[in-house]
């Protein structure tokens, strides 16, 4: 059975991810304590199910410490992947302001008194920012072994498309994610390796190329005619290829390689696509253009 375990920050898009899994034919359960997942997997396997999606988060915080042990147990019999969704504090504050919902940890002890509504909880409430940072600290041990997605700048449609791509591949040793981004919008927090290509010739200064992207042929032709661009792409390729076996030996399931230029529209997009084309011959590869997804 393939099992996708979704966890991460409240408000980061876990419900969206779980809905994508459900649409793809997964049997999905929200807010299931980790210790119950193996029993559920056995039951569903006996019933003929082949795909299970489970979301567990801070609402089940008493069981969060058991997640690593549960993952180890499940991997003895199943293909298990773990997805960790996160977002910046500013992005989460804005989302909570828009929805007017309360953060699970904004109430004293993380939950109201038994039988009372949240507003009746005794003791002072934790501020939203304090609750977010508290949750981030509590969940931090789960981020490293998971594939992380920073949804700070992702629209819902872009996140849905990314999740679809994430679950579409077959089991393998490692997934390579090549992600383009613009430094003026911040470095992706889910990146394992970051390469700065801002020193390369910039198509932005050609008025005919400015509205295009690194996936458009005129921009590709321009960049491919620049020796510096080809040399930079080759050096990054060689670095990733040289050290990829070390990441695999470290039992990594995912490696996110972020390529950044100024705006994330031309140079980084082109190089990310070029690297993805090369490494597809070596295994499973995903591509994400962060700023293009935002502008889509």
UniProtKB/Swiss-Prot annotation:
<dbReference type="Pfam" id="PF22740">
    <property type="entry name" value="PapZ_C"/>
</dbReference>
<dbReference type="InterPro" id="IPR027417">
    <property type="entry name" value="P-loop_NTPase"/>
</dbReference>
<comment type="similarity">
    <text>Belongs to the RapZ-like family.</text>
</comment>
<feature type="binding site">
    <location>
        <begin position="8"/>
        <end position="15"/>
    </location>
    <ligand>
        <name>ATP</name>
    </ligand>
</feature>
<protein>
    <recommendedName>
        <fullName>Nucleotide-binding protein RSc0403</fullName>
    </recommendedName>
</protein>
<keyword id="KW-0342">GTP-binding</keyword>
<keyword id="KW-0067">ATP-binding</keyword>
<feature type="binding site">
    <location>
        <begin position="57"/>
        <end position="60"/>
    </location>
    <ligand>
        <name>GTP</name>
    </ligand>
</feature>
<dbReference type="InterPro" id="IPR005337">
    <property type="entry name" value="RapZ-like"/>
</dbReference>
<dbReference type="Pfam" id="PF03668">
    <property type="entry name" value="RapZ-like_N"/>
</dbReference>
<keyword id="KW-0547">Nucleotide-binding</keyword>
<dbReference type="GO" id="GO:0005525">
    <property type="term" value="F:GTP binding"/>
</dbReference>
<dbReference type="GO" id="GO:0005524">
    <property type="term" value="F:ATP binding"/>
</dbReference>
<dbReference type="InterPro" id="IPR053931">
    <property type="entry name" value="RapZ_C"/>
</dbReference>
<feature type="region of interest" description="Disordered">
    <location>
        <begin position="99"/>
        <end position="124"/>
    </location>
</feature>
<dbReference type="InterPro" id="IPR053930">
    <property type="entry name" value="RapZ-like_N"/>
</dbReference>
<comment type="function">
    <text>Displays ATPase and GTPase activities.</text>
</comment>
């Amino acid at each position: 059975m393939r099992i996708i375990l979704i966890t991460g920050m409240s408000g980061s898009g876990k419900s969206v991810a779980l809905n994508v899994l459900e649409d793809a034919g997964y049997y999905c359960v929200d807010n299931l304590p980790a210790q119950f997942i193996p029993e559920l997997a056995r039951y569903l396997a006996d019933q003929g199910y082949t795909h299970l999606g489970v979301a567990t988060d801070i609402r089940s915080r008493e069981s969060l410490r058991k997640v690593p042990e549960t993952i180890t147990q499940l991997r003895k019999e199943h293909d298990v992947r773990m997805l960790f969704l996160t977002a910046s504090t500013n992005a989460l504050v804005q989302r909570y302001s828009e929805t007017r919902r309360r953060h699970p940890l904004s109430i004293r002890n993380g939950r109201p008194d038994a039988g009372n509504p949240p507003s009746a909880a005794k003791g002072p409430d934790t501020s939203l920012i304090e609750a977010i940072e508290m949750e981030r600290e509590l969940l931090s041990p789960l981020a490293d072994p998971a594939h992380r997605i920073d949804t700070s700048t992702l629209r819902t449609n872009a996140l849905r498309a990314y999740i679809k791509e994430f679950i579409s591949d077959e089991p393998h040793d490692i997934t390579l994610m090549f992600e383009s981004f613009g430094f003026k919008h911040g470095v992706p927090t889910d990146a394992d390796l970051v390469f700065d290509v801002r020193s390369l010739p910039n198509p932005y200064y050609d008025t005919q190329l400015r509205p295009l992207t690194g996936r458009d042929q005129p921009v590709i032709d321009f960049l491919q005619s620049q020796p510096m661009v080809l040399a930079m792409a080759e050096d990054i390729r060689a670095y990733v290829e040289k050290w990829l076996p070390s990441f695999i030996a470290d039992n990594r399931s995912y490696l996110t390689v972020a390529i950044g230029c100024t705006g994330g529209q031309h140079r980084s997009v082109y190089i990310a696509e070029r690297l993805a084309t090369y490494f597809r011959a070596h295994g499973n590869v995903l591509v994400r253009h962060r700023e293009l997804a935002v502008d889509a």
